Amino acid sequence: TDPDADEGEFLAEGGGVR
């Protein structure tokens, strides 16, 4: 859930824009 998360977290929890 980090604003600078990786693709995995980005797609899973919608973290950062990567």
From Swiss-Prot:
Keyword Secreted among UniProt keywords:
yes
Disulfide feature: none
Q: Indicate what this protein is called per its UniProt record.
A: Fibrinogen alpha chain
**Record keywords:** Adaptive immunity, Blood coagulation, Coiled coil, Disulfide bond, Hemostasis, Immunity, Innate immunity, Secreted
Q: Is Cell inner membrane one of the keywords?
A: no
Can you supply one Gene Ontology CC term for this chain's record?
Answer: extracellular region
Compartmental location: Secreted
Q: What is known of its domains?
A: A long coiled coil structure formed by 3 polypeptide chains connects the central nodule to the C-terminal domains (distal nodules). The long C-terminal ends of the alpha chains fold back, contributing a fourth strand to the coiled coil structure.
Mark the transmembrane ranges: none
Q: How does it assemble?
A: Heterohexamer; disulfide linked. Contains 2 sets of 3 non-identical chains (alpha, beta and gamma). The 2 heterotrimers are in head to head conformation with the N-termini in a small central domain.
GO BP annotations, alphabetical order: adaptive immune response; blood coagulation; innate immune response
Specify the species: Camelus dromedarius (Dromedary)
What about PTM?
Conversion of fibrinogen to fibrin is triggered by thrombin, which cleaves fibrinopeptides A and B from alpha and beta chains, and thus exposes the N-terminal polymerization sites responsible for the formation of the soft clot. The soft clot is converted into the hard clot by factor XIIIA which catalyzes the epsilon-(gamma-glutamyl)lysine cross-linking between gamma chains (stronger) and between alpha chains (weaker) of different monomers. Forms F13A-mediated cross-links between a glutamine and the epsilon-amino group of a lysine residue, forming fibronectin-fibrinogen heteropolymers.
Task of the protein: Cleaved by the protease thrombin to yield monomers which, together with fibrinogen beta (FGB) and fibrinogen gamma (FGG), polymerize to form an insoluble fibrin matrix. Fibrin has a major function in hemostasis as one of the primary components of blood clots. In addition, functions during the early stages of wound repair to stabilize the lesion and guide cell migration during re-epithelialization. Was originally thought to be essential for platelet aggregation, based on in vitro studies using anticoagulated blood.
